[in-house]
Amino acid sequence: MANLMNEFPDIEIKQDEPLMNYTYTKTGGPADWLAFPETIDQVKELVDYVREHEMGLTVLGNASNLIVGDGGIDDLTIILTRLNKIEVHDNKVTAQAGASYIATTEAARDSELTGLEFAAGIPGSIGGAVFMNAGAYGGETKNVVSEATVMLPDGTIKHLTNEELDFGYRHSSIQDNNGVVLDATFALEPGKYDEIKARMDDLNERREAKQPLDLPSCGSVFKRPEGYYAGKLIHDAGLQGYTSGGAQVSTKHAGFIVNIDHGTAADYVNVIHHVQKTVKEKFGVDLETEVRIIGRQD
């Protein structure tokens, strides 16, 4: 394989870079190559190169809702956090894929636009939020996104409407076409700064009171099974505090798995499988992961 640092001298690229330095869980082995594009043109150059050389491609944002295997990731991994511009025009906020959801909600608040308060504490990037239709406290990304710009694997760029994004529970059409989110536009409503801020502050206080924000985690691990709450099932199964290696079912919120002592991706996966098995045995309910598990599971 060619040396990508020589192929792309204008893009910061690292070889065999440990991904634990970038993930919220503080786990993950090395990426063969890790690139930090700063423009859409640079993203396209990388995507085109991967296609032409039949390489694998993994695209990450804030890496907040995923577990990267201890063996790392093959070929090229792109982190989009340097594509982080946020612009406000009238009642619309457009944010690049690498912008944080939190910063985007703050930009909306500062422009007295309401509709994004639910996302005030979601730690992910805009790209990840659109990719998985992130939501919290009764709100979902699908309710406020009017369109998104997506680069398809063949390098073409498309502007997809809300309908074309085909949002579902923790799902969008981008998961099906292997596209890369470049930006998203949110259609909001005029509001009052003080009211918007009060709502955001309230949700953040609730989040801090209930969630283990003081420890590394991948956020909410499981999707909500129909008719149930994953956290309650895990609590009722007596699994809070269950530990494998350095990963533990949070004693503060059963829906979270936290890294308490140099946990590995394998530790996280072991806890996930034990929770799934136990909940299935006790309640007959299948817990499906919301968190994405990617990379080499060595």
Curated annotation (Swiss-Prot):
Keyword set, alphabetical order:
Cell cycle, Cell division, Cell shape, Cell wall biogenesis/degradation, Cytoplasm, FAD, Flavoprotein, NADP, Oxidoreductase, Peptidoglycan synthesis
Give the source's domain of life in one word. Bacteria
Q: Where located?
A: Cytoplasm
Q: Does the keyword Repeat apply?
A: no
- InterPro entries, per database record: FAD-bd_PCMH, FAD-bd_PCMH-like_sf, FAD-bd_PCMH_sub1, FAD-bd_PCMH_sub2, MurB, MurB_C, MurB_C_sf, Oxid_FAD_bind_N
Cofactor(s) recorded for this entry are:
FAD
Q: What is its main location?
A: cytoplasm
By its UniProt entry, which SUPFAM superfamilies does this protein fall under?
A: FAD-binding/transporter-associated domain-like, Uridine diphospho-N-Acetylenolpyruvylglucosamine reductase, MurB, C-terminal domain
The UniProt entry's GO CC annotations, sorted and at most eight, read: cytosol
Q: Has keyword Oxidoreductase? A: yes
Care to name a GO molecular-function term for this sequence? UDP-N-acetylmuramate dehydrogenase activity
Name all FAD-binding PCMH-type domain ranges.
26-191
- Reaction(s) catalysed (UniProt annotation): UDP-N-acetyl-alpha-D-muramate + NADP(+) = UDP-N-acetyl-3-O-(1-carboxyvinyl)-alpha-D-glucosamine + NADPH + H(+)
Query: What PANTHER family does the annotation carry?
Result: UDP-N-ACETYLENOLPYRUVOYLGLUCOSAMINE REDUCTASE
Q: What NCBIfam families would the database entry show? A: murB, PRK13905.1
Write out the function statement from the record: Cell wall formation.
Q: What is this protein called?
A: UDP-N-acetylenolpyruvoylglucosamine reductase
Species the sequence originates in: Limosilactobacillus reuteri (strain DSM 20016)
Recorded name of the encoding gene: murB
